[in-house]
Amino acid sequence: LLIEQAINHNVRNVVIGNQKLFHSVKEHLAPLGINVMGGNDSITQYISTSTDIDLLLTAMVGFSGLEPTLAGISRGLTVAIANKEPVVAAGEIIMRMAKEHNATILPVDSEHSAIFQALQGEHSPIENIFLTASGGPFLNTPVEELEKVSVAQAINHPRWKMGKKITVDSSTLMNKGFEVIEARWLFDVAPHKIKVLVHPESIIHSMVSFSDGSIIAQMNMPDMRLPIQYALTYPKREFLNIPRVDFYKLGALTFNEPDLSKFPLLRIALEALDKGGNTPCILNAANEVAVEAFLQERIK
């Protein structure tokens, strides 16, 4: 896919993090005059030294995205963050560095993009943030059946097409816990002001309330192309050919409180945020190991 994208978009430089695939990528692209680099260190080095980066979009899986993100921020770049783990593990550092280096942070996660969009043009303090959650594939699964679920079931999300790791996190609601931590740092909001709502339709992606009782919601059909494009074209909006919300067919929107006894990882994530320090970083590391073990069917 990387080779295909590089050719289709006529790029000048390609960095492949997986060293095992470096030679294969180079064999295909070097004859076309494309400079190919290998290894995660090369990604960070390129970001740190390149003079032709207009916008940096970090979409690496897990904690590996932290160093490239910090490299872009230290350059004062506009950084669109698509992977939440760096913000979960080092949100305070990221936002402090962004302020010091006058870097712009654009959230790509659908919920945080929704909050960001709702805040455009607003100068009043936030009263509350409402983070919506679809509830994942096991929303209506009895608790006693959860220990029997398969990998195939856990990565079959009812609303979103995503990578395996984030889909498993969505199944356990750990993803939503991470998003609460992320929102705390991205928008400088006290944890108790961030509420999670289970919203199975996934039409409202987040809401922001203000001191006068107003609530601003961002809505669209569940499609990641919208928040991705918004980050790439910000502050402009460009036409996007995705299905529009049909309120007549939709009929109703539902909201429920998350069941923390059924989905304890959300509770653990909220506790980690309250505890602070390096606790969210430890939680992120433990979760990455556990999810990988689950995907390899070594744990249930």
Q: Could you tell me what each predicted segment is?
A:
Residues 1-300:
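Catalytic, metal-anchored helix/loop core of enzyme active sites in primary metabolism
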